[in-house]
Amino acid sequence: MSQKNFFDEGKSYGVNDYAGFHFENGADSSLPQVSAQGVVRETDSSNFDASPVASGSGISDVGPFGADFHQLQQHVQTPYGGMTMPASSSSGATSVPPEQDPSLSVSFNRLPKSASTKTKNGRIRSSRREDDNRIPFYDLDVAEGAEDDLQEDFHVEGMKTKSGRKIQRPVAYNPNATALKRKSRKVDMVTLCSVCQRGHSPLSNRIVFCDGCNSPYHQLCHHPPIDDATVQDVDAEWFCMKCQYRRAKQPLETGMTAQDLGLSESDKKMYLSSLPTPHLADLILFCEKSYPSLPIYNPRTRELLGEIRHQLLVSSERQQISLQERLHAKQDEAPSDEPAPVPYTASYVANSGTLYDYPTLIRLAIRNTLSPSKDEIFNWLAQNVPLLPTFHDSASEAIRWMVNKGQLVRSGSIYQIATVEEYPHLQPSLLPTFQRNRKVPKLVPVSFPTDDPQNLCATVL
């Protein structure tokens, strides 16, 4: 097989043109084998002798290559620019290690990446071994330290999916976190007296709250009236009569003197003011029985008793008025005992002013006409129900819907209600509520409807 020329015959090449080629030492290969775009094919280094090429290339810096020429490199300036090429150890060039991160300790594989052999027809066959693409061995301690440094410098704001979309991890729920309080508008409470149900509180008639049940009372509405000194003294406790009677049911324990207990005047006053009024009255009466000569009554006691009785009458009248107002309000809300007019009758629909749906009106028309055809139904509706003059289309649609739903049965031009139940107390009306709650029996026609009423009969299941 003749050798194939890859270059034009008229073009000459210089010795420095070896930069773009890869030379081979074969006897039958006088020209280098070049691949596309100046990429040199990899050849077997065991069959390659670079000494004649280097000696005849005119480059004085490069000496003859030794057996370890693939381990040494040097930088050479050529007309095509600077390049790095193998150099012999005898030329004085130093070994250039591969570029690497100084923080990483790397041990590279120094074996050739591939080996190629020639076939009988002159073609080059490349054979690769499993250890050609060998991964460099890193020092694990140094590598882990470098990864930690990279993680510290790299801050991820959000994760990315395979499609490149950013996602963010949801925030974990913290049950101990304080919830944000919603801003709410403060509403002033309207205080109403428990007796008169009024909220005004003038200076002469203040509203006072009970310290027992927290019920509000006007000074003059409560019985007995509340003293002004109690209102002015903020620290003083006041209980309404209901709370006082409730507390008075508990027995009062006595039997000790103030000297035995070592009580001061303030302690005595504080204890006696905390007692309910009935208990205080019992104590005073007990003291009066023991010492009848004690001057504890007011000279104007008779007049004061008259005023107290008058206030009792006024307060009782106020209570009666408030009770009557509440009773009347409840009676107005309660339904009356008079029977309400029966709805869905002709007179009720005509006079009540309430307009019902078309199915209800059609039932009324059928009940109140002798031969309820469509024209008779429309005439009855026009005379007894306040409808618009153009109600015929809507009424016709309602009749058709009732026939399809089985609520009406058509016998020729006559329509009848599909029910056999009668309500004597509601004649001639039919309540739709009863119709909805009751199951309407299904109608199975024996024959198809015709104009002849006798040709249509229905069987009630």
UniProtKB/Swiss-Prot annotation:
Pfam families: PHD (PF00628). The keyword Metal-binding applies. It is found in: Nucleus. Residues 102-119 have a biased composition (Polar residues). A zinc finger (PHD-type) spans 190-246. GO terms for biological process: chromatin remodeling; heterochromatin boundary formation; negative regulation of gene expression, epigenetic. InterPro entries: Zinc_finger_PHD-type_CS, Znf_FYVE_PHD, Znf_PHD, Znf_PHD-finger, Znf_RING/FYVE/PHD. SMART domains: PHD. GO terms for cellular component: chromatin; Lsd1/2 complex; mating-type region heterochromatin; nucleus; pericentric heterochromatin; subtelomeric heterochromatin. Disulfide bonds: none annotated. Keywords: Chromatin regulator, Metal-binding, Nucleus, Transcription, Transcription regulation, Zinc, Zinc-finger. Transmembrane segments: none annotated. Component of the SWM histone demethylase complex that specifically demethylates H3K9me2, a specific tag for epigenetic transcriptional activation, thereby acting as a corepressor. Has a role in regulating heterochromatin propagation and euchromatic transcription. This is SWM histone demethylase complex subunit phf1. It comes from Schizosaccharomyces pombe (strain 972 / ATCC 24843) (Fission yeast). The gene is phf1.
